[in-house]
Amino acid sequence: SGDPEPVLTRLDHARDLAVASLQEARRSVMVLRPRMPEGTDLLGALRLLTDRLLAGTDIQVELSVLGKARALRTNLQEELLRIAQELMTNALRHGKARWVRVVLEYEPRQVCLHVEDDGRGFDPTAAVAGYGMRSIRESICKLGGRMDIDSSEGLGSRITITLPTRRWRP
C-alpha cells in the first residue's frame, strides 16, 4: 500500500488539467469582447485575433478576402470580429479542428464572413442551444442578417454569416 505511483499519476493528471484550464481562461479573458485596433482594417484585426486565439496550438489558419474590401462602420466590424472569434473558439474547443479558413467576402450590399474547419462537425439543430451560437444568432438578427450552417458530425463545418451593409455605411 506504500506504492506512490497511483498518487503521482493523479498529480500529473491534475497538473495537466490545471495547465489546460489556465490556457483556456487566458484565451477567454483576452477575447471576451474584441475591439478594432486603431489604424487596422478588419482583415488585420482578424489576423491579430487569430494569432492570439490560436497561439500555442498546432491549428493552421488561412485568412483571405473576396471582392473589394471597403470601410465598414466600427460597430459592424467589431460584431464580425466577435462572431469570428466565437466560431474559431468553437472549432478549437469543441471541433478539435486542425485547420480553420476565414474568408471575408465583400459584395455590393452585404458582407459575408465564412468560417470553415476540418473538425468533428456537429448537428446544426443541436448547436442552437449553446450560448455562443445563440448569442451570434441574436446579434445577426439585430443587424438584419442571417447565418447558414453546413455541418455534419465527422465532416467539419462551414458557417456563413451574411450582414447587410447598406444600413451601416460610414
Model-flagged regions — what are they?
Residues 1-170:
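Coiled-coil dimerization/phosphotransfer module
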